[in-house]
Swiss-Prot record:
Protein's recorded name: Dipeptidyl peptidase 8
Organism per entry: Mus musculus
Subunit architecture: Homodimer. Forms a ternary complex with NLRP1, composed of a DPP8 homodimer, one full-length NLRP1 protein, and one cleaved C-terminus of NLRP1 (NACHT, LRR and PYD domains-containing protein 1, C-terminus). Forms a ternary complex with CARD8, composed of a DPP8 homodimer, one full-length NLRP1 protein, and one cleaved C-terminus of CARD8 (Caspase recruitment domain-containing protein 8, C-terminus). In the ternary complex, only one subunit of the DPP8 homodimer is bound to NLRP1 or CARD8.
Catalytic activity, reaction form: Release of an N-terminal dipeptide, Xaa-Yaa-|-Zaa-, from a polypeptide, preferentially when Yaa is Pro, provided Zaa is neither Pro nor hydroxyproline
Gene Ontology biological process terms from the UniProt entry: negative regulation of programmed cell death; proteolysis
Amino acid sequence: MKIPSGRCNMAAAMETEQLGVEIFETAECEEGNGESQDRPKLEPFYVERYSWSQLKKLLADTRKYHGYMMAKAPHDFMFVKRTDPDGPHSDRVYYLAMSGENRENTLFYSEIPKTINRAAVLMLSWKPLLDLFQATLDYGMYSREEELLRERKRIGTVGIAAYDYHPGSGTFLFQAGSGIYHIKDGGPHGFTQQPLRPNLVETSCPNIRMDPKLCPADPDWIAFIHSNDIWISNLVTREERRITYVHNELANMEEDPRSAGVATFVLQEEFDRYSGYWWCPQAERTPSGGKILRILYEENDESEVEIIHVTSPMLETRRADSFRYPKTGTANPKVTFKMSEIVVDAAGGIIDVIDKELVQPFEILFEGVEYIARAGWTPEGKHAWSILLDRSQTHLQIVLISPELFIPVEDDAMDRQRLIESVPDSVTPLIIYEETTDIWINIHDIFHVFPQTHEDEIEFIFASECKTGFRHLYKITSILKESKYKRSSGGLPAPSDFKCPIKEEITITSGEWEVLGRHGSNIWVDEARKLVYFEGTKDSPLEHHLYVTSYANPGEVVRLTDRGYSHSCCLSRHCDFFISKYSNQKNPHCVSLYKLSSPEDDPVHKTKEFWATILDSAGPLPDYTPPEIFSFESTTGFTLYGMLYKPHDLQPGKKYPTVLFIYGGPQVQLVNNRFKGVKYFRLNTLASLGYVVVVIDNRGSCHRGLKFEGAFKYKMGQIEIDDQVEGLQYLASQYDFIDLDRVGIHGWSYGGYLSLMALMQRSDIFRVAIAGAPVTLWIFYDTGYTERYMGHPDQNEQGYYLGSVAMQAEKFPSEPNRLLLLHGFLDENVHFAHTSILLSFLVRAGKPYDLQIYPQERHSIRVPESGEHYELHLLHYLQENLGSRIAALKVI
């Protein structure tokens, strides 16, 4: 391959705003690069061989700065306007963070000044909102429910993980330790200048309370989940009431399959929905001066879902753990919507709680629906809404559900029939939008409903990938048309009976890039100026930026953040300030505050003014060398991106052992212009020891459009390694220090799966595979994930076979010291059974392997000692079997 102008196609994606052009930092080709036939044969470089104790000290030294970096990460920002016209501050911004030596997440705030001195950089001070209080827990002290939710949310910190806030009253609500707490700041009570001592929400519940939420219609009331049922509590009167009675807290899980208000495993793990109940934002007034508060909730029946048992002495008092886990091709939970109406008097006391169910069964009203992906309420509380998916996840519906569609739960058949007959025929679900794709639908969080201005219309902004293959914003107006279906006439409704016609659909954004809508990204709508703010990849698939455009008259999309960095942003409710947490490959994250303004006659062209710093960059890390980003044109026609970590003391005339770090699965992008020195610091450690480290995003990874991501539809495991090998060979053609005879591969979860695939499919390329928590048999994995990408197992037998390494164990190499498996014994996501069944087939085929079990760990390694041991084992195994001179002797 010829190299233009004697330079390699290597880029750090560093761009300068001042020049107004895209500037790539390129790396000079190493001496001897090119295709010269007479270049001297390079000698292998062997990494130094350390003892286990020496490696342990080396890791401890590299982690000193790493711990400091992890402690400085404010997040979950919320702006509250100050109302004092003569005061020096315009807003107070709240956030969660860890400070100093304290490793516990807690609430902080900073004051935003009305004016700044533009000649100096203002650093906002972090002020603790909460006084110290006893709510700390070590990892091993979490309840089972908390452990599992933390796994689903990928939470690794202790302390406060989330908070709820009611703007009108200034009420904060949060869970800490085993308790639920509340405080007031802002609102009619003014703003505190001293840390507040949280108030414990007292309870009669014996077990952990989860998922607390403030009632937006009356912040004196909260709801929470206790033992798979919904409870409510009044913060003022301290009255507490259980409002659902579906779970019996039986010791035998098989006899107690129902839950209320709880998102089941697949919804949490595969759809990022962690709650199963939703307060109505408005209360209905009663003639006596009281009010009716409503909660929409889902009720699940998991009686047909398989129970998985995990037995381990490390569970201490729990000798066995049991989980409902729907394996692909088997039954999912049966789900329905229900509604609870809480009638309270003028003094706030509960008069009655009415449990209501749908007038007809869920499966009749919502034929073909398998998953409740999202739910909520319209702003006026007139309708609940839900985003629904079929089992194949190729058909999506957005439906409106009126509270009138629910009737009181009644056991007497005649009384129930009278209640059904009392519901007018005109009250039905309304399908206000639907879409279909032949790939799959990626669920996201973008759905903004405008206040209704016409009784027979509803307007909303939604994001869709189905129309163009890239997720973009659309403003849709649907006509709320009365259904043709007449319940009183008998018979069953057809799905089309509830479909509303689309009056208008406006394309807000377009192009071969995507609007971000998951993992914290959403949209902010300025209804007064008819603007929508969003995060997207318009300027580069490797960088996330904040943009604004008009949704009334779509046209120019204006970028608000600086190029050369990747940003994660949060806007104030008035859209006059935004906070960006940003970094790039060279610079650790900063958090800065910006003020937005624009001419009245040109609201889209915002002027961004730097206002203050919330977190300054820690500067370059000692002994850290950032990777270089590269790209190449794949034979598939796609541009693929990768990262290259060069050995720190690169010597000419040497070729170096190479480690391919891999994930390669959907919904993840490893290669981007973000700082990698915290989460992926081990890759720098490998480079410091003398390894080349390569990371490549193959087809199937995210932020590149549905066609790119959908390339492995029905054939997971069959295309990814081709892309990875092509990337390695491309790099070897550019750099002669890459030793393709000494390549190792390592990844976790899907990356562990592909590490096995690599050794099985291309043992000629990969000398060593280190596979963490791998899927080895797709029929053992869950419905929501596996069927989305692979289809139903009955309809794709060949794909399931070719994608399952356990079924092809005979293809693994017969030499020892080439395969290391790592797995947490308590893994509730990719069960340890995946590893054990692979081992059974490897033994049957007479194939060697090495195994490391982590008895206390689930899918993610959380115990610090386990994490240290894992990294030590990784370094030692690579040293002994890939990088050192002794490894070369083993091959001989």
